UniProtKB/Swiss-Prot annotation:
Heme binds at C355. Pfam families: p450 (PF00067). It is found in: Cytoplasm. InterPro entries: Cyt_P450, Cyt_P450_B, Cyt_P450_CS, Cyt_P450_sf. One of its GO terms (cellular component) is cytoplasm. Its cofactor is heme. Disulfide bonds: none annotated. The gene is cyp106A2. It comes from Priestia megaterium (Bacillus megaterium). This is Cytochrome P450(MEG).
Amino acid sequence: MKEVIAVKEITRFKTRTEEFSPYAWCKRMLENDPVSYHEGTDTWNVFKYEDVKRVLSDYKHFSSVRKRTTISVGTDSEEGSVPEKIQITESDPPDHRKRRSLLAAAFTPRSLQNWEPRIQEIADELIGQMDGGTEIDIVASLASPLPIIVMADLMGVPSKDRLLFKKWVDTLFLPFDREKQEEVDKLKQVAAKEYYQYLYPIVVQKRLNPADDIISDLLKSEVDGEMFTDDEVVRTTMLILGAGVETTSHLLANSFYSLLYDDKEVYQELHENLDLVPQAVEEMLRFRFNLIKLDRTVKEDNDLLGVELKEGDSVVVWMSAANMDEEMFEDPFTLNIHRPNNKKHLTFGNGPHFCLGAPLARLEAKIALTAFLKKFKHIEAVPSFQLEENLTDSATGQTLTSLPLKASRM
């Protein structure tokens, strides 16, 4: 298992709320320390848009093959590890292209087109259960269940087992915690074993009887004569499930938070013009996706970032800060769904490792927000809501555990 870089020692936020809305910290780092060395973690930290983009795309100087990482996902147990042939986050081109191609079979544009009606049906069902005039917990009612149900459905597993998937994902994506890491690792190993034992028979069955789902697509996937074994498919779906669920759930919950607290007029504007929803989703990804970061290892000595970097140095790029760079985005600390270049955000990365699941996350968010906007004309915050008490650590930063709101059709 790789050494996990303790990024909390770099940020040193005093409250969960401060980490959830890290704008002051991002502004300070962009203005005062755009490329800076952090002695405690022995890392170089990069914040400016062009520098972050350079590190993510220039694999000849900044490699994904590394001994340290900021990502604490999954476990190093036999059942919970990522198969070597799809370790796309830990490889550079040309190896990376082959590994990514194997995985990309599950995320083709054709697949997305086929999935759209299914996602629409699930979103409509969840929103159909909400009553206007009453208090709705948007996390429990939509942001949390939608991605889980969608992923379970797209993978072709029985709908009755969806809640099991939620439990496993929550555990496998627990963040790094230096004080409790031994306990966290044990929980992850148990979850990985339970998941593996549950899914393996389903994969075996789908090899015999393929269907229109992700598991069957992975079983058919072939690049240069290489295919997945049943074992590899099980472990691969664990990665897909976790990444697909966490990202979308986070995006949906934070979008509703933003509509309630960042700019209350945006909801009404979207309600009156649903064509603006895709733009709003992009701005939420730029403005309200908290602290996203990735790490790379310096491949050879260079001064491309204006400092002397040595081979083997660890570099952490902060995409969230890059999304707030005023040299790229005008008035960056303001929510603006009409921003002409908001799709240039780096939330899903850049270069060879651009997030494979980005189109699915965008599609789910667009469908869910549109369906909600069609049903409810107005939303308002619940005065008793305390943000600090409703946040928890996750692999994607501070995650909302609850977000009550009042919605009305009038």
